């Protein structure tokens, strides 16, 4: 009878461990969504602050000779720098170890 109780104890422990793994996976997914939403909101906040600053100024900034990105490409660049893909194939997914993506850089810095 002792072996049966030991076996039943292991089965119960296994069920609890599996449930805990499911909960951890759900928490991980929630955390990823929260981080992505946070990055989006930070970029939106930055964009709104820039827009407000432009409205408050009477004159426009002039380019200093370098290539100036449009607002939409600046937003894509910000997302990319935050660690997210902006290319059509992987849009919104996190870049693994912030590795560069040729597709993303082509979208941001390539010619129209």
From Swiss-Prot:
Cofactor(s) required for function per UniProt: Zn(2+)
Annotated positions binding Zn(2+): 85, 87, 101, 104
Organism: Lacticaseibacillus paracasei (strain ATCC 334 / BCRC 17002 / CCUG 31169 / CIP 107868 / KCTC 3260 / NRRL B-441) (Lactobacillus paracasei)
Subcellular location: Cytoplasm, Nucleoid
Any Gene Ontology biological process: DNA replication
Quaternary context: Homotetramer. Interacts with both DnaA and DnaN, acting as a bridge between these two proteins.
Signal peptide: none
Protein's UniProt name: Replication initiation control protein YabA
